[in-house]
């Protein structure tokens, strides 16, 4: 398969030390050579070499560059690739790109370099998606999961499962097409059930990693809730180590939602500092309270903050009711002041959920809170060598559908259906697993997936 030659700026826009303009395609080296001036021609350069020179337009030097030449097939796209390393200015970099486009290159679409790597067989679809997961990783663990997926851990596992299914299907077909051959082993219902159960168990095992994998990939929407002036904004500022939220002694200072990402002991949290939840006649504050209630309802995880220096109120107890059904940690703040809170009542309301005491003004209790968060979601380190985690929503959905098809095989066999009938569900499971790696996938889906990538990737 041969494509045209594409070009794009691969580094983020704006000022910086270095900017990279990338080309890929059959004419990549020749097009770069038309605007690059140095002692030796790029067209004669050996693969994986770097060359110093200048970019010129109509004889005028517009940039001093280092150019990397990489010849097919030992490149990311398996095509000829050229990377022009220029100074990180906006004007000069765009001018170099425009020169390349005028000399025969086409502007790359978002994700087109990675798409070509997939279409040319360099990587499969799950590995391609892992590239974006790596770019978006917010913790070391998330990065590790993405790297292992890029390395093909998930791909190998899925291909092994598909091969198990294919072996069973092939034996069923032989039995159907050549029933008269005595030397062909008969695929009995019992044998097919055993093979199906092996594959089904592996799919279920993968799905058991989905909740942790999804946390690593997307982060937990974490609502910080409580009555006004209990220390919610102080908690946000402490966790992110930045004065993001305004903190005063005046109740109702926070009127709107404040969001910030933070990595807490490997758990990526999307912190949402909410307006204090209480009854109010202030129109603006009332809007903030309604948004807080919605954030609470939509949250994956809740930090429920109480003031230890005040008695428990009806509004506090209502927050426990609202948090029911969520994972949450109770934060008893202001332990530097006299305790007026009924701790036994708090324990009764919290049930099995952790309770942590803090004095945020004195920087006390934050480590205990972070440990409680980690223990709640990761019972031990998940960064376990070659462990394979499913974190992609598309992959999870396909695994659920494949499991449903395999359950159909099991049910059909138990009901005494002929082997050639239950193979329909078996074939469906094989196809669904193939969609994860891209072995069976529609062009429309490919376009949709790769359009989510950044330009130049």
UniProtKB/Swiss-Prot annotation:
Manner of cofactor binding, per the entry note: Binds 1 potassium ion per subunit.
Keywords assigned: Cytoplasm, GTP-binding, Hydrolase, Magnesium, Metal-binding, Nucleotide-binding, Potassium, tRNA processing
TM region(s), chain numbering: none
GO cellular component: cytosol
Residue ranges annotated for the TrmE-type G domain, each copy included: 219-378
Binding site for GTP: 229-234, 248-254, 273-276
Cofactors, names only: K(+)
Residues that bind (6S)-5-formyl-5,6,7,8-tetrahydrofolate: 22, 83, 122, 457
Binding site for K(+): 229, 248, 250, 253
EC number: 3.6.-.-
Molecular-function GO term, any one: metal ion binding
Subcellular location: Cytoplasm
Coarse class of the protein's main subcellular location: cytoplasm
Keyword flag Coiled coil: no
PROSITE patterns for this protein: G_TRME (PS51709)
GO annotation terms (biological process): tRNA methylation; tRNA wobble uridine modification
NCBIfam families assigned to the protein according to its UniProt record, in alphabetical order: mnmE_trmE_thdF, PRK05291.1-3, small_GTP
The protein's assembly and partners: Homodimer. Heterotetramer of two MnmE and two MnmG subunits.
Protein's job: Exhibits a very high intrinsic GTPase hydrolysis rate. Involved in the addition of a carboxymethylaminomethyl (cmnm) group at the wobble position (U34) of certain tRNAs, forming tRNA-cmnm(5)s(2)U34.
Family from the record: Belongs to the TRAFAC class TrmE-Era-EngA-EngB-Septin-like GTPase superfamily. TrmE GTPase family.
Protein name: tRNA modification GTPase MnmE
Gene: mnmE
